[in-house]
Amino acid sequence: MQDVVIVAATRTAVGSFQGSLAGIPAPELGAAVIRRLLEQTGLDAGQVDEVILGQVLTAGSGQNPARQAAIKAGLPVGVPAMTLNKVCGSGLKALHLGAQAIRCGDAEVIVAGGQENMSLAPYVMPGARTGLRMGHAKLVDSMIEDGLWDAFNDYHMGITAENLAEKYGLTREEQDAFAAASQQKAIAAIEGGRFRDEITPIQVPQRKGEPLGFDTDEQPRAGTTVEALAKLKPAFRKDGSVTAGNASSLNDGAAAVLLMSAAKAKALGLPVLARIASYASAGVDPAIMGIGPVSATRRALDKAGWSLEQLDLIEANEAFAAQSLAVGRELGWDAARVNVNGGAIALGHPIGASGCRVLVTLLHEMIRRDAKKGLATLCIGGGQGVALTLARD
């Protein structure tokens, strides 16, 4: 089978909930990163075999949002596109599918990634289709129902984090310390310009005057301390330890990579940023969905023939501090190699885009450090994990 390589990788800066990107639909965010991939490589858009993008909150987004993004990006109408939903793992599963297509010879060039605008997720009214003859009607928040609610146990994702905190004996103090460190690392990375090369600026229309460029993650909070986080009330259980401060946030953004067969990249004279060494998915108990990266990581490492100790860098999505700490405890990885520029607790978690966002951040940090082996992994609502390893030979 053919080696699959990444020749370009980019993301938008992550917008806060109801923040700078709130009015820009997910397909437009996706289109922006696709255009940037083509600009960076000089690739003729007609050479793209398919576009595969994750998006979780598709209600009200129109037919096949990935197709919308592809057309808006200027790809020819003959280039097909697919939207996939694997909840938080969608953006990374898109790379799995793209790599599979290339490895088996079905494609040579794939755009893969994810897009999400949580700010625009609509409220829906169940039952209205068949008529509301009398009485009150109920509005359902599609963002919570389709993105943040466990369909098996009928509770919020935050309860799954509480379950892990209880199972692993994780204290509120440990979780707050983890969250504060994530914020501090992210602020240091932003101030040091470490995200600059991976971010595609977005032009945000204004009511008056020219559009404003948006190129800096706006979720991280400078000056966050453990003491400040300790003042927050539990968000999901009265006697719980998971708060808004030690959990990821609601966000908007997009990310994408350009995948090619190694032979195609060589023929086009494009430099290879990294090779996809392996990828894997796994299922776990939905009640402790956050532990999903453990089995997914072990499977991916086994496929690559690597040990955990060989990894130079790891990007593990921080859905919750409790979840991240539980995964770290199970795998026993070196925390100094994990999310070195902060994670989703600070940077944000636009759910359909996050899988590719962590991959893009991993890749650019590997380039910056000349790292050879890296891992991207995420937990997934409903009880799954997803992982992918990168090699820079």
From Swiss-Prot:
Q: Which cysteines are joined by disulfide bonds?
A: none
Q: Which GO terms describe its biological process?
A: fatty acid metabolic process
Q: Which GO terms describe its molecular function?
A: acetyl-CoA C-acetyltransferase activity
Query: Which PROSITE patterns does the record associate with it?
Result: THIOLASE_1, THIOLASE_2, THIOLASE_3
Location(s), subcellular = Cytoplasm
Q: Name one GO cellular component term.
A: cytoplasm
Name listed for the protein in its UniProt record: Acetyl-CoA acetyltransferase
Q: Which organism is it from?
A: Pseudomonas aeruginosa (strain ATCC 15692 / DSM 22644 / CIP 104116 / JCM 14847 / LMG 12228 / 1C / PRS 101 / PAO1)
